[in-house]
Amino acid sequence: MKDLKHLLYFENLLQEAQNELILQAQSEGKVCVAYVCENTPEPLLNLPGAFSARLRAPRTGSMEMATYYMTSFLCEYSRALLERAIEGGYNFADCLITPDGCTMMNRAVENMELLKALGKGKEKFFFEYMEIPMKADDNGLNLYTLQCTNHILKPLHEHYGIDISDKAIRQAVAEHNRICELIRAIGEYRKGDKPRITGYEFHVITLATYVAPKYLLIDKLEETLEELKSREPDEKGYRARVLVVGSEVDDTDFIKLIEDTGAYVCACLLYTSDAADEGLGVD
């Protein structure tokens, strides 16, 4: 298939944790709210005047320092983040909010705070730790609401003057929903015998929305969606349609490797909340 117009642009956003859109948003005076886990509600991190960026550690090499502090028993992702933080790779962040959904991730962020690895030269920088409910019932909802208020809304307002009114929250939710609509619409082109987008391309596009200011991506996502409507698909050349399931992965080459063997990744629960419905035709 003909290359997508903005694919290289999306790929380049994934090359560095501090990508060009983060720099652009901060030059506009916006606050960078870093996070490390999907249990942190993204819309609340993208209130007017702020934007979210999920921390990554692209091209990680040695993790000796992080392993010293966390041992080799903890997952590579948490150690890679700590290693990059020690190297000074996240000093662009204005705050870091993390949930306790994963002990390893929590420990990584605690080490960042103890080692003063983030926030150099930023007097307003803060760390916040959320308690995540284990049950989706009324008590769990009340706890989650309280945690979001105490560890996201209030700190952002008190430290940076971010508007946390209902109107501001609804605006952020609307923007988040628009991103979700575009991603779902783009993902629809993975269906059918001759899909118009590869699993690798979809992974790259989806991941870009996690690591860059969303409002700066909407126009390119809309253009990509329009482009797919008229994109000529390849003749069926894959041997099987594959659903990949597991923990989140931010290594797009992993999906590319699978597709290079002749498979087609039509759905992946490693980086999206795809439902494996009948239309995806999983083999």
Each model region followed by its residue ranges:
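Bacterial Sec-exported substrate-binding components of ABC uptake systems
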Residues: 1-35, 221-240
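Gly/Ser/Thr-rich loops at beta-strand to alpha-helix junctions
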Residues: 35-43, 99-106, 243-251
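An N-terminal, globular interaction/scaffold subdomain
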Residues: 40-86, 94, 109
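Short, acidic/turn-prone active-site loops that include or flank metal/cofactor-
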Residues: 56-62, 132-133, 269-270
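Acidic/His-rich segments in extracytoplasmic proteins that coordinate ligands and/or metal ions
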Residues: 80-157
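Catalytic cofactor-binding cores of redox enzymes
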Residues: 122-216
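Extended, H/D-rich, highly charged conserved domains that either
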Residues: 181-269
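Conserved small/polar residues in nucleotide/adenosyl-binding loops
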Residues: 271-276
